[in-house]
Amino acid sequence: MKKSLYIIYILVISLFASSCHEQEEFANDPYGNFDALWTNVDQHYCFFKYKNVDWEAIGQQYRAKLRPKMSSTELFDVCSDMLKELRDGHTNLMSGWDVSRYWIWEQYPKNYDERIVNEYYLHFDYRQSASIKYGILSNNFGYMYYGDFMGAIGEGNLDNVLAYLASSEGLIIDVRDNGGGNLLNVEKLVRRFITERLHAGAISHKTGPGHNDFSQPFDYYFEPIDDTRIKYLKPVVVLANRSSFSATNNFVSIMKTLPNVRIVGDTTGGGSGLPFTFDLPNGWAVRMSASEITDANGNVTEFGVDPSPGCKVDMTEAEMAMGKDAILERAFEVLEEMASNRK
């Protein structure tokens, strides 16, 4: 059955809520709050089979660090360290003074410098429509930077952007340092680059407390934008780095399936789980990956989406000091190759 991402999202949330069994009550003390955290993650986290962790042993290891009179800060640190064992940027503990996080991209080259792009490639001559910065570079390749999928983009905005870029020989979509946001904006953008219905991926939700209790995958599809709107069907390169996370990871995985698209840069930061939030007895909020999103081929992209073959590039400090963006330069080469193959 054909399902849009919006319908799937609502369906998964509804099914997740209906699948939750009666919750155990926990005391509002260090042990009760810890047990509430461990139990909810144990029953609802969706990536145990990929993370190669013994959650039972991890729980015992960190519970042994508790003390009846420990401070809230000490408890927060113990719980945060336990969650980091999952290696999941979508899994966070949120208190009134801090948010735990696992940001693996901090260990890798940054691979993006906004100033270099603005000064040496756009020459500070660009347009801005809603959350999209765009322009045509000196080599007649179009460039658009979308730095946040939470940023609103209307259909009119996309018409204006793509109409301006229509004369370009190819298009670069830069989503480096885009930490994610609204999946519906992913769909809105992808629809401008397809001419027929696209199988974008599938979503599975938890059906019970067991680590392998999952529904059958729900396939979701994107429809091309109607012919009254503007599409871009020339060669496209998407630029990504390790900070391309969550909804951006999803966008890159979908665009990579299109025949006229290449991915250049570094592996994305992953984050393919659909988050769910719950509260501990003391009021702290917990966010975790609770529904599994796969790509159209059934592959889990929780650990990131690799660049297209031959398109892995890192930026060096020496190049950046000279105002060179090696990832953008490689994108030019790829677009030239793709353009020559079309002739």
Locations of regions flagged by a protein language model:
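C-terminal "post-core" interaction segments
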Residues: 21-35, 40-41, 179-343
